[in-house]
Amino acid sequence: MKEKIAKISILANVILAGGKISVGILSNSASVFAEGIHSLMDVFSSLISFFGIKISKKPADKEHPYGHFKFEVLAGFLITLILLGTGLGIIYEAYQKFKNPSLIKIPILALSVMIFSALINEIMARLKIHFGKKENSVALISDGVHSRVDVFASLVVFVGLILNKYWIFTDSVLAFLIGLYIIKESFSIGKEAIDSL
């Protein structure tokens, strides 16, 4: 069941990433676009982790007498670098948007995609936490908590889209904060990878 939930989660994040990135571009919203990139990074992180764990479970062989567990650590470092680069890119784009602010086009579309994102992430959070507890999987519970954090991120962007009407810099400030959050996440994952050595 763990693998099934992981696959559903990856599929959900692919749909959310595509929706948010498209709507972010169409509506000229840096924060919605940044959230889309964040969802896309969740997909890459999940895939890298999935394959890293799969390889690390291989038994020891002639070339790897101590096993393959370091592949999982290597996957963690790769995720760290991807997230760090993404966070820095989002911060740069937010800064550019802050220098040249503009109103969000089609705000109803941007608002709709963020509410949809919050609902999907809440459903995924509940599923992961439920099955994580049922199957005693710390990884699944942790991923469920991560999905719950994504719910709050979507709601913050939703509120920001409403406030952007009153303060034009809201969107770029939120995109900047999302970029900082992604960088913070990259350091957390990097620390976990180092600690597991």
What are these regions (language model features)?
Residues 1-197:
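Alpha-helical transmembrane cores and adjacent cytosolic helix/loop segments
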